A protein has these predicted regions:
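Short amphipathic alpha-helical elements of helix-turn-helix/winged-helix folds
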Residues: 84, 231-232
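Short coil turns linking two alpha-helices in DNA-binding domains
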Residues: 236-239
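Residues in the recognition helix of alpha-helical DNA-binding motifs
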Residues: 242-243
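Conserved DxG motif in ATP/Mg2+-binding regions
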Residues: 138-143, 213
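Active-site helix-to-loop segments that bind/position phosphate- or nucleotide-bearing substrates
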Residues: 1-127, 133-138, 146-159, 173, ...
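Flexible, glycine-/charge-rich segments associated with ATP-binding catalytic modules
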Residues: 35-37, 42, 149-231
């Protein structure tokens, strides 16, 4: 097992030749109380809100890395949070032979978005990683800014990952696309769903990247001319139903 962890970058030999956990290995497989010794500001937070909640109101359910009742590492956090998010995603009935296909491009895009945040977060930064889920959107905010231009990230093909060893580890569990393809893939899936375009916002000092994933169709913009048309349609409907 140590040899395997060494090969994937979770362990490395020290000056005495002994295998020790790397920073990436600690984040992926360690316990929270061990992780915070290396990353004092390390904190993972998942919050669920119901439809009636405003963004300032209290969550209805929560998972945090510091609770002490689970490991608190990013691997376990990934699976706990993904399973919570995925349970609300509708799966169309499709068969592969006699087997039902329960994994859709939307599921894959959600895994990509979650893994991207965990992989590219700056865990030395003083603000933790926060994921918030409402029935109509998911917001993922991680410490650290893009290491490339945002427009380049949206186009794809260019990548400057902060934690390359974490990419390798997530790839071993079939999570994460090839370098530089994550955001374009997510946007493509959202477009095919007919949903509003995902929004990316960068903030600085402290650096923070926030990805908002709408889970609903784009709203039609009504211009001044459109309002007149809508009014005429309403009059026509009332006239139709009164006759």
């Amino acid at each position: 097992m140590e040899d395997f962890l060494h090969r994937i970058g979770a362990m490395a030999r020290d000056a005495d030749g002994k295998l020790r956990p790397t920073a990436a290995g600690l984040l992926m497989f360690g316990h929270e109380y061990e992780i915070v010794r290396e990353f004092p500001h390390y904190f993972l937070d998942y919050q669920e809100h119901d439809r009636s909640s405003t963004e300032d109101e209290r969550w209805t359910d929560r998972i945090v890395s510091s609770s002490g009742d689970w490991s608190g590492n990013i691997c376990d956090f990934y699976f706990r949070v993904y399973n919570r998010i995925a349970q609300d995603i509708k799966v169309p009935f499709k068969l592969n032979g006699a087997d039902r296909i329960d994994d859709t491009p939307l599921h894959k895009a959600l895994r990509e978005a979650l893994a991207n945040a965990l992989i590219h977060a700056d865990y030395y930064d003083r603000r933790g990683l926060v994921i918030q889920k409402w029935p109509d959107k998911i917001r993922i905010a991680n410490p650290g800014a893009f290491r490339i231009n945002v427009q380049e990230a949206l186009v794809g093909g260019v990548s400057d990952p902060r934690n390359e060893s974490l990419i390798k580890m997530f790839n071993l569990i079939n999570v994460g696309e090839r370098a530089g393809s994550g955001l374009p893939s997510i946007r493509s899936v959202w477009q095919k769903q007919g949903w509003q375009v995902p929004e990316i916002v960068e903030a600085f000092n402290p650096d923070r990247t926030t990805l908002t994933l709408p889970l609903s169709a784009a709203k039609m913009a009504v211009k001044s001319g459109g309002k007149k048309v809508a009014a005429l349609l309403n009059i026509a409907k009332r006239t139709f139903y009164s006759t």
